[in-house]
Amino acid sequence: MDSNTVSSFQADCFLWHVRKRFADQELGDAPFLDRPRAHQKSLRGRGSTLGLDIETATRAGKQIVERILEEESDEALKMTIASVPASRYLTDMTLEEMSRDWFMLMPKQKVAGSLCIRMDQAIMDKNIILKANFSVIFDRLETLILLRAFTEEGAIVGEISPLPSLPGHTDEDVKNAIGVLIGGLEWNDNTVRVSETLQRFAWRSCNEDWRPPLPPKQKRKMARTIESEV
């Protein structure tokens, strides 16, 4: 096993521990409080994949971080901060919407790269909006924390979340996953729209009602429908 992979996991475990302690004392704002919840599943998945115990890794990570801090001068810290591009955290969902449990009558799940797409196929003829919490850098989506599909009544009927065992995804991965989710929901005659924040940063192209361009398969389906009506 690569030593850098192990040390990276150990450092991540300790940094998660620090964030969790900070959050437990209610010292963080909403974006900060979201991160420990989202990263916990990822660490468990990585620990299982690497065969490493999280508690032991956290202790080792503490030693790594302490050693770095001992060697770090104030001037070097200022230079590091100045050279790192700042990312922004954007929220469509409240903490309650993020953490709420939901159930599917007719569950369907699909994995697309490092993202898991889930939807309830029993939902029909509903108006649905997609909301997401994510970070942005250089005016593009950097990391998706969680995306959920809501009916007008507030019920959750779909979700896109990063797989804990496969960290890392691009804005293109998210765009493709959203297309899959929209296609699945629209198959049952639901009307789906995307929040303006997500639309703006997940992809650049859009049509007049702030919807993503239809994938080729959906375009062919729509064309056949129009032809049959004519």
UniProtKB/Swiss-Prot annotation:
The dsRNA-binding region is required for suppression of RNA silencing. A motif (Nuclear localization signal) lies at residues 34-38. Homodimer. Interacts with host TRIM25 (via coiled coil); this interaction specifically inhibits TRIM25 multimerization and TRIM25-mediated RIGI CARD ubiquitination. Interacts with human EIF2AK2/PKR, CPSF4, IVNS1ABP and PABPN1. One of its GO terms (cellular component) is host cell nucleus. Belongs to the influenza A viruses NS1 family. Inhibits post-transcriptional processing of cellular pre-mRNA, by binding and inhibiting two cellular proteins that are required for the 3'-end processing of cellular pre-mRNAs: the 30 kDa cleavage and polyadenylation specificity factor/CPSF4 and the poly(A)-binding protein 2/PABPN1. In turn, unprocessed 3' end pre-mRNAs accumulate in the host nucleus and are no longer exported to the cytoplasm. Cellular protein synthesis is thereby shut off very early after virus infection. HAMAP family: INFV_NS1. Disulfide bonds: none annotated. One of its GO terms (biological process) is symbiont-mediated suppression of host gene expression. This is Non-structural protein 1. GO terms for molecular function: protein serine/threonine kinase inhibitor activity; RNA binding. Upon interferon induction, ISGylated via host HERC5; this results in the impairment of NS1 interaction with RNA targets due to its inability to form homodimers and to interact with host EIF2AK2/PKR. It comes from Influenza A virus (strain A/Pintail/Alberta/119/1979 H4N6).
